[in-house]
């Protein structure tokens, strides 16, 4: 389930990048 972690990191990056 590494792809799930990658997707979560992308979503988190959007929030942290805001």
From Swiss-Prot:
Which positions bear N-formylmethionine?
Answer: 1
- Alphabetically ordered keywords of this record: Cytolysis, Formylation, Hemolysis, Secreted, Toxin, Virulence
Establish whether keyword DNA repair is in the entry: no
Q: Where in the cell is it found?
A: Secreted
GO BP of this protein: killing of cells of another organism
Q: Domain of life of the organism in this record?
A: Bacteria
Q: Does the keyword Cell membrane apply?
A: no
Q: Which GO terms describe its cellular component?
A: extracellular region
One of the entry's Gene Ontology molecular-function terms is: toxin activity
Query: What is this protein's function per UniProt?
Result: Virulence factor. Causes hemolysis of erythrocytes from sheep (HD(50)=4.79 mM), rabbit (HD(50)=8.76 mM), guinea pig (HD(50)=2.00 mM), dog (HD(50)=5.35 mM) and human (HD(50)=6.34 mM). Acts synergistically with beta-hemolysins from S.aureus ATCC 25923. Cytotoxic towards human dermal fibroblasts.
Protein name, entry field: Hemolysin H2C
Q: What is the lineage of its organism?
A: Bacteria, Bacillati, Bacillota, Bacilli, Bacillales
